[in-house]
Amino acid sequence: MNKTSNNKLIYSVLMLVCVVGFWLFENFYTPNTYSQQTENGPTTSVASNLMPSSTTGDIVEHSHYMLSYNEPFEQAEWVAYTLKKEHLTNDDRKRPYFIEDPKVRTKSADWRNYKGSGYDRGHLCPAGDRRFTEQAYNETFYTSNISPQDREFNAGIWNELEMQVRIWAKQHGELFVVTAGVLEEGLNEIGQEDVDVPRYYYKIVARGNGDDLKILAFLMEGKQSSKPLKQFVVSVHEVEKRTGIDFFQKISKQQQDQLEAKVDTGSWKFKF
């Protein structure tokens, strides 16, 4: 064997080792959980009096958000979290791998269902809202916290809504947020586990408490739009009708009827 042939063989073997090594790392050397770390940082307890109902009973509580998992659709029917002004930091975090949620009884969908599907792994509790500690950031990479989203939608109007919520958190100090895709029959599916692709997504934002409680709900089709965010505002009743979820079940019936039926954009300043 001449020198040129020998070099080609060595190069080919090295390439094969690299490819196999990357595959093994990607498939077998990811962590089992992101919830074992203990770090000092801002508190993120979710306001119990604002928690929505669960149509499945499969409620999971993480350190920095809660969710209700819907196994037939292989994603959360809602993710709820508190967003405070002090949560919004510019800490540089290393992006971790997406992993299955160890707290979901039936196991959340594997991230590989999204591979080659053409859809983004769209965060529900945004990673950008949880940069204040490594644990908080990493917890957003459980697959129970993602939903298939069109890439232009995820990077466009949905991202604008997330940025608008951050602006409100800075203005008002603290918000309660609940969000997910609308899970309904007849949706397209991706991957071996048949992860459903929602046609619509909702986000409900609340601030204050008692008689000072202010609520704003958004419902938008999962495709890019140049419309201002105000055009996607709906009543909470509309989102409840579409999802079957009772979003503010623990406040008085009188206050529910009053707040959930109206659309109050006047109490919120819009940038987008």
Model-identified regions with their sequence ranges:
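Domain-level detector for secreted/extracellular nuclease and nuclease-toxin modules, and
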Residues: 2-272
